[in-house]
Amino acid sequence: MHALRNFAGNGIANVFGCGIRRRLSYVLGIETSCDDTGIAIVDTTGRVIANVLESQQEFHTRYGGIIPPRAQDLHRARIESAYQRCMEAAQLKPDQLTAIAVTTRPGLPLSLLVGVRFARHLARRLQKPLLPVHHMEAHALQARMEHPEQIGYPFLCLLASGGHCQLVVANGPGRLTLLGQTLDDAPGEAFDKIGRRLRLHILPEYRLWNGGRAIEHAAQLASDPLAYEFPLPLAQQRNCNFSFAGIKNNSFRAIRARERAERTPPDGVISNYGDFCAGLLRSVSRHLMHRTQRAIEYCLLPHRQLFGDTPPTLVMSGGVANNDAIYANIEHLAAQYGCRSFRPSKRYCSDNGVMIAWHGVEQLLQDKEASTRYDYDSIDIQGSAGFAESHEEAVAAAAIKCKWIQPLV
């Protein structure tokens, strides 16, 4: 049942055994949790057979944020053609699919409904098992598809995206333990709101970019990257929770003060926006590093030993893992503890169908009998969803005092 638990160094193919190495299985993944329509096919060796992604970013950027009913309409308009294109690219017949995996939780309910209804229809028509997928679990496990020899269970994962910020220990699909989570905003959400308030979208090069990408690029233009410094959130709380509302509000105040000093017009951007973005990135990096550092130390406690017998491993995933400056700092932090660090390829950090298909593969690997479900109508959506276990209280009770590792820049 737990063939993958001690799998580091063995490779995916070895876990399956000779019989399955001769006959590949294909899992179709469907992702519609927010504003991306993703459909992909992954085989049981982790090879991506086809990957189709329809982004709604350009539409929602024009309106300053995601509009759930319009996101649902766009998913409905695109999902059938995305599926057809995926099957054509894979050069497979529908009956060659082994199973269909679909995001059921968490996410925007209106968006989730489109994917789940389409998946039910497809599974029923093809008489294939339907595998429900936890969206954040899929982010956490994605790097294993690309690094099967290096990432074994258990491992620590920092999940940072537009809707979430969590620290979890992964032991397998459906077997994640929460160590800490954001108490308010997620980092990607904060980047988007700060980017809009800074009015980076006025600049032609950032017109169609999300806030995080624009801020990362603008930070590279800084002449004085230490010009802005923001208070560290939750500095007195010895747990692994996050808070980005303070950084966001302090950013708004700093922008407003600079605009007043420069008399920036309503359609203008402060002159030292590069310095501001560099300071913002450093502050977010410090906060992520501090909470992750405590999580590493908690995992290494003699009476916990949450890494088990595997080499200590830290994975960062989610849309914010695309940010090279932030990931470099997380990588730097991990190295101080002799901890290996990984992230998915950039094309797989943000939402996509590949990670959903791969989670389906992981479910089948862990327990094929339990994962093979034909009770289609009982598989439904959940707008919010937690994990199997939580150590949040235990982390706080441990009250670990850390000697902080400083960011690279």
UniProtKB/Swiss-Prot annotation:
The record's family statement is: Belongs to the KAE1 / TsaD family.
Q: Which organism is it from?
A: Drosophila melanogaster (Fruit fly)
Residue ranges of coiled coil: none
Just give the chief location class.
mitochondrion
Q: Which residues bind a divalent metal cation?
A: 135, 139, 351
The gene name on file is Tcs4
Q: Name the chain's protein.
A: Probable tRNA N6-adenosine threonylcarbamoyltransferase, mitochondrial
Transit peptide span, please give it: 1-31
Q: What's the EC number here?
A: 2.3.1.234
Q: What does this protein do?
A: Required for the formation of a threonylcarbamoyl group on adenosine at position 37 (t(6)A37) in mitochondrial tRNAs that read codons beginning with adenine. Probably involved in the transfer of the threonylcarbamoyl moiety of threonylcarbamoyl-AMP (TC-AMP) to the N6 group of A37. Involved in mitochondrial genome maintenance.
Q: Where in the cell is it found?
A: Mitochondrion
Annotated residues for binding of substrate: 159-163, 192, 212, 216, 322-323, 350
Checking CDD domains in the record gives:
ASKHA_NBD_OSGEPL1_QRI7_euk
The note on cofactor binding and number reads: Binds 1 divalent metal cation per subunit.
Class of enzymatic activity (EC top level): transferase
Give one GO biological process term.
mitochondrial tRNA threonylcarbamoyladenosine modification
Gene3D superfamilies annotated for this entry? 3.30.420.40
Question: Reaction catalysed by this chain?
Answer: L-threonylcarbamoyladenylate + adenosine(37) in tRNA = N(6)-L-threonylcarbamoyladenosine(37) in tRNA + AMP + H(+)
Instruction: Note the InterPro entries from the entry.
Output: ATPase_NBD (IPR043129), Gcp-like_dom (IPR000905), KAE1/TsaD (IPR017861), TsaD (IPR022450)
**Cellular component aspect of the GO annotation:** mitochondrial matrix; mitochondrion
Give the UniProt keywords, A-Z: Acyltransferase, Metal-binding, Mitochondrion, Transferase, Transit peptide, tRNA processing
Q: What cofactor does this one take?
A: a divalent metal cation
Can you name one GO molecular function term for this protein? metal ion binding
